[in-house]
Swiss-Prot record:
Quaternary structure (record): The COPII coat is composed of at least 5 proteins: the SEC23/24 complex, the SEC13/31 complex, and the protein SAR1.
Superkingdom, natural source: Eukaryota
GO cellular component, one term: Golgi membrane
InterPro entries: ADF-H/Gelsolin-like_dom_sf, Gelsolin-like_dom, Gelsolin-like_dom_sf, Sec23, Sec23/24_helical_dom, Sec23/24_helical_dom_sf, Sec23/24_trunk_dom, Sec23_24_beta_S
CDD domains reported for this sequence: Sec23-like (cd01478), Sec23_C (cd11287)
Organism: Coccidioides immitis (strain RS) (Valley fever fungus)
Protein name in the entry: Protein transport protein SEC23
Role noted for this protein: Component of the coat protein complex II (COPII) which promotes the formation of transport vesicles from the endoplasmic reticulum (ER). The coat has two main functions, the physical deformation of the endoplasmic reticulum membrane into vesicles and the selection of cargo molecules.
Family: Belongs to the SEC23/SEC24 family. SEC23 subfamily.
Entries under Pfam families matching the protein: Gelsolin (PF00626), Sec23_BS (PF08033), Sec23_helical (PF04815), Sec23_trunk (PF04811), zf-Sec23_Sec24 (PF04810)
Its membrane topology: Peripheral membrane protein
Gene designation: SEC23
Localization annotation: Cytoplasm; Cytoplasmic vesicle, COPII-coated vesicle membrane; Endoplasmic reticulum membrane; Golgi apparatus membrane
Binding site for Zn(2+): C63, C67, C86, C89
A GO BP annotation: intracellular protein transport
């Protein structure tokens, strides 16, 4: 099968099962696997939207303990004997009584060959409706605070009527608003400089009153929780408290504490989050809920502070962190990581929305979001459409009018004896579950076959890594083609109020002892690039930047040495197969990307970029690693994809750059001059008017279903904003190189970075020399 046909097949599988594998044939031995260089891995999107897939309204049929694999199309079913043989552990299991009518021609949906992914609605209802606790920073400009208030009031109409809502505001003090008290506005105030224990918070809020700590009775899904829990004074159903919540929000004022000109406002973000988590964990442990933080500046007081209140003291930079010149960093990270452990244990999600040009301490707080599957939205101001539209998208609904968000999810991976799971890289925490599927080595969050994601959405994707169990030795006699299998079980609380289980079962052939060509052909360079990018980012969080770049280079050289065709020590003979040719290019752009190069980005920005990369599936991750560039000119109709190269900048062209985080329209020199001269408004220049509008229309389409909303930039050649484009282009025309062949075409880029051409020359030289 040629590469294009294979690509189509992999895309089809991705649409159906939400999975892409780095290798689609598995090596037979661990020795062979180590020579592949790129690990066996999968990018899996558990809740990938499949509008055509049925939702089964019964419990799944599972194998005996300890296996617990779910019945799937790869199971051997003996219809006459009413038994099925589990492909994972080979145990025989009886079919349940309600399968008595199945025949060769009438089989249940989960046994259909196309049902490699299937979803069950379980009988277990959620313990409470979804909870939304808003935590709002009042130390901000009047217009910013008003924008947050307006967005929150508007969001009440987007929530299910039975959803519970609460409000905490903070500045110098943190205030928990008692929404259930209707006589007047009433709130409980916590001192911003004090570190409260969970017990103190519960006592102060009256949540430990005798007799009120009994477990809440089970209620019907879709009904509001009975208001017996002590927390019901603070968290009320939207339909019941819409008026009070709107009233409290509209009356919110800026923090009254005076701020001197040479000081930052006193902001107790740490106390506010600690109180929010304490309130939720008392009455709603393991009930789906979101703590949504809206902040416009750094914590300057109390536990978790990231910078002092004096303006002459700058907030930490990457340079300070490298030199260990960090006064508050370690203490703040420890504080927020402890909160993250508590909140992920309780099953609640933390989202952080930022409206600030300055850093707010996202680097220190990242554990709260990354371990709970929350959202990070980084914008310059809450008044921007970027914030407003991103916030609305959190509450998107599906065709059945349910919120497209899952709560309290857990992912378990089962494998056949040939494979072992080594870890997961993504927004989750380990459930420390050991099984025969757990490998000896560790990649990412390892030593477990099960992870907890408090929040999960249709785009949430996870990198899952595997190793081969077989150490080698004489190959056993194999009957027919031999396959290795993996099964992904995702339990989650659906926003309709029931628990669901999504099951994806994957089988791939094992290579024969001499199956080198089959292995090479099965390489999916796009999935591999994303899986390697996740490992590089995981390493970058703990290792030095240069060490990570050396690791990326070393792995690339080894892969090319292993799979390219060449004569030893002859770089001109170097050739890569079609399914490897783009991989070096992806690695070139990855090592130049903001994920690994921190220069020119603040620690908060780096944290945000890495967070989003670890959330998205293959297609969007590749756009982040290697942005797309389209060109528009009067000579061609519509957009023409062009190389991400400085030679693509031409005076008579308009470029549209998509980096996922930014969408940029760049006008070449001549185009910009014509636009400034107003030709588009004159008669007879319809073509020019159309070509100015076309990239804007295409940009609108790109923005349509992206989260968080990208920043939209329109700039001209020579303008300051053009730096966003120039920093992404391959510098084939620099001040020192000139164009190829001595002729200068395209824009000169002032940089010491090597071009892709030079990078490939070095790569070929090292790959053919056999040195790593």
């Amino acid at each position: 099968m040629d590469y294009e046909a294979l690509k189509d097949q992999w895309s089809e599988i991705e649409d159906r099962d939400g999975i892409r594998l780095s290798w689609n044939t598995f090596p037979s031995t661990r020795m062979e696997a180590s020579r592949l260089v790129v690990p066996i891995g999968a990018i899996y999107t558990p809740l990938k939207e499949r509008p055509d897939a049925p939702l089964l309204q019964y419990e799944p049929v599972t194998c005996k303990q300890p296996c617990r694999a779910v019945l799937n199309p790869y199971a051997n079913v003996d219809i006459r004997a009413r038994i099925w043989i589990c492909p994972f552990c080979l145990q025989r299991n009886p079919l349940p009584p309600h399968y008595k009518d199945i025949t060769e021609n009438t089989i249940p949906p989960e046994l259909h060959p196309q049902s490699t992914t299937i979803e069950y609605q379980l009988a277990r209802p959620a313990p409470a409706p979804p909870i939304f606790l808003f935590v709002v920073d009042t130390c901000q400009e009047e217009d910013g605070l008003k924008a947050v208030k307006d967005s929150l009031v508007m969001s009440l109409s987007l929530l299910p009527p039975n959803a519970l809502v609460g409000l905490i505001t903070f500045g110098t003090m943190a205030q928990v608003h008692e929404l259930g008290y209707t006589e007047c506005a009433k709130s409980y105030v916590f001192k911003g400089s004090k570190d409260y224990t969970p017990k103190q918070i519960q006592e102060m809020l009256g949540l430990l009153a005798p007799g009120l700590r009994a477990p809440a009775p089970q209620q019907q899904p879709g009904r509001p929780a009975p208001a017996v829990a002590p927390a019901a004074r603070f968290l009320l159903p939207v339909q019941q408290a819409d008026f009070q919540i709107t009233n409290v929000l509209e009356q919110l004022q800026q923090d009254p504490w005076p701020v001197a000109n040479d000081r930052r406002p006193l902001r107790c973000t740490g106390v506010a989050l600690s109180v929010a988590i304490g309130l939720m964990e008392t009455s709603f442990q393991n009930a789906g809920g979101r703590i949504m933080l809206f902040t416009s500046g750094p914590a300057t007081e109390g536990p978790g502070l990231v910078v002092g209140p004096q303006l002459r003291e700058p907030i930490r930079s990457h340079h300070d962190i490298d030199r260990d010149n960090i006064k508050y960093y370690k203490k703040a990270v420890k504080f927020y990581d402890n909160l993250a452990k508590r909140v992920s244990h309780n099953g609640h999600i933390v989202d952080i929305f930022i409206g600030s040009l300055d850093q707010v301490g996202l680097l220190e707080m990242k554990g709260l979001v990354n371990s709970t599957g929350g959202h990070m939205v980084l914008t310059d101001a809450f008044t921007s459409s970027q914030f407003k539209q991103s916030f609305v998208r959190v509450f998107d609904r599906d065709a059945n009018d349910n919120l497209v968000m899952g709560f309290n999810a857990a992912l378990e991976v089962l494998t056949t004896k040939e494979l072992k799971v080594t870890g997961l890289i993504g927004h989750a925490v380990s459930l420390n579950k050991k099984s025969s599927s757990v490998g000896e080595t560790e990649c990412g969050i390892g030593n477990t076959c099960s992870w907890k994601m408090c929040g999960i959405d249709p785009a949430a994707s996870y990198g899952i890594y595997f190793e081969i169990a077989n150490q080698g030795g004489p190959a056993p006699m194999q009957q027919g083609p031999h396959k290795a299998m993996m099964q992904f079980l995702t339990y989650y609380q659906h926003s309709s109020g029931q628990y669901h289980l999504r099951v994806t079962t994957v089988a791939r052939p094992l290579s024969s002892p001499a199956g080198d060509s089959a292995l090479a052909q099965s390489f999916d360079q796009e999935a591999a690039a994303v899986l390697m990018a996740r490992i590089a980012v995981f390493k970058a969080d703990v290792d030095d930047g240069p060490d990570v770049l050396r690791w990326v280079d070393r792995m690339l050289i080894r892969l090319c040495s292993r799979f390219a065709d060449y004569r030893k020590d002859d770089p001109t003979s170097f050739r890569l197969e079609k399914n490897f040719t783009l991989y070096p290019q992806f690695m070139f752009h990855l090592r130049r990307s903001q994920f690994l190069q921190v220069f020119n980005n603040s620690p908060d920005e780096t944290t945000f970029y890495r967070h989003v990369l670890n959330h998205e599936f293959v297609g969007d991750s590749l756009i982040m690693i290697q942005p797309t560039l389209d060109s528009y000119s009067l000579d061609h109709e519509g957009a023409q994809p062009v190389l991400l190269d400085s030679a693509s900048i031409q005076p008579t062209h308009i470029l549209l750059l998509d980096t996922f985080f930014h969408i940029l329209i760049f006008h070449g020199e001549t185009m910009a001059a014509w636009r400034k001269a107003g030709y588009q408004d004159k008669e007879g220049y319809d073509n020019f008017r159309a070509i100015l509008e076309q990239p804007k229309e295409d940009a609108k389409e790109l923005i349509q279903d992206r989260f968080p909303l990208p920043r939209f930039i329109i700039c001209d050649a020579g303008g300051s904003q053009a730096r966003f484009l120039l920093s992404k282009l391959n510098p084939s025309t620099t001040h020192s190189s000139g164009g190829y062949g001595g002729t200068q075409s395209g824009q000169t880029i002032f940089t010491d970075d090597v071009s892709l051409h030079t990078f490939m020359e070095h790569l070929m030289k090292l790959a053919v020399s056999g040195t790593n």
